[in-house]
Amino acid sequence: MTIARTARTATTTTRIIHTPADMTQWIGRAEPFETARARYWYQLAQPYEAQHIGLIGFACDQGVRRNQGRIGARAAPPLIRRAFATLPVIADLQQRFDGQLSTLLGDAGDIHCDDNDGFAESTLEQAQIKYADAVSNVIKQGGLSIGLGGGHAIAYGSFLGLWQTLESQKNADVAPTIGIINFDAHLDIRQSDVATSGTPFRQIAEHLDAHDQPFHYCCIGVSRFSNTAALFDRAEQLGVQVISDEDCHYQPWDTLTDRVKNFVDQVDIIYLTIDMDCLPSSVVPGVSAPAAFGIELGFVERMVRTIMTSGKVKIADIAEINPTFDIDSRSCKVAARLLATMVEQHLLST
C-alpha cells in the first residue's frame, strides 16, 4: 500500500484510551402531555452494567488512512448515539419488558485512537486489542455487544473480542463454529504489509487457520467495480459466499434469504457487521468510500431482521460512517435506524 509506506517517514505521537460513557450524548425531546408510553431510547440508556445490550464506540479511522480512504469516521460514534437516542422505544418492547426497561441497553463508552492525522505504527492494532477487551466484557456477561465505528478495521477487533470470550469459556472438545455476515460493497480481504480497513476478514481467516478452525464468511452487497479480480480469486480460495449488489437487486427475495439462512444453519455463532458503504451514496453520502450503486436500505433492514431472529448473533457492529461528508445527518440517521433494528430484533428474540 503506497500511502502506508510513504506515511512511515513521519513520526506520529499516538494515544489509545477507553473513555467511559458520556451520558450527555443521550438527549431527546420531552413529552409532558403524553402517557408514559411516549418513551425514547435516551430515557432508557445507562452506563453499561450487564444490560442485555452494550454499545461500544470505536473512534478510530487509522485503518481507513492506511487503506487510502477518506478519513473522518472516528467522529461517528457519538453522532450515531445521538441519532439513536431520539428514536422511540416501540410498544412491543415496552410491553415485553414492562418494569425492566432499565435492563435493556447500556453504553460502554468509546475506544479513542488519537493518531494526529498521520500513519501511526501499531496504533490501530492497540486500539483493536483494547476494543476487543471491551467487547469480551459485554459478551461474558451474557450481553450482545454492538460496536459503533469508526473504520471497518473494527471488524478484526470485534472478532478478537468474540474469540477471546470463547477461549475463556472452553469446556468442550469441539469449539463452536463462527460465521461472519458482512454487508459491504468490498470483500475486505486485501493483502497488505499492515492491517487496514481493507484487511480484517483476511486477518480473521488467517487467525482461524492458525487455530485449525474453519472460515465461514458471507459478504452481501459486493460490487464488481469495488473489488479487483485478485480479490475475487482470494474469495474463491477462502470459500467466501459472495452475494453481489446486483444479486440483491435482481434475484428473488426467497432465493437470497434461503442462501443466508443456509449459511446461518451451518454455524453456531454469528458475527454481524454492516459497512455503511453497502448502501447507495444517495442514501448515505457520509461514508469513507461512497457507492455508486449499492443495495436498498429496505433490503438490508429486512435481511438484518432475518439474521437476528436466528438467535445466533452474539456480536455486531456498524462501520464507516464519515460525518465529514454527511448531509443533514442523513447517514447517521440511517445508521441509527439499522442499530434500532438490531436492538429491537435481539430483544424480541431473547
Residue ranges and their predicted role:
Residues 2-350:
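Conserved alpha-helical scaffold segments that buttress catalytic/binding sites
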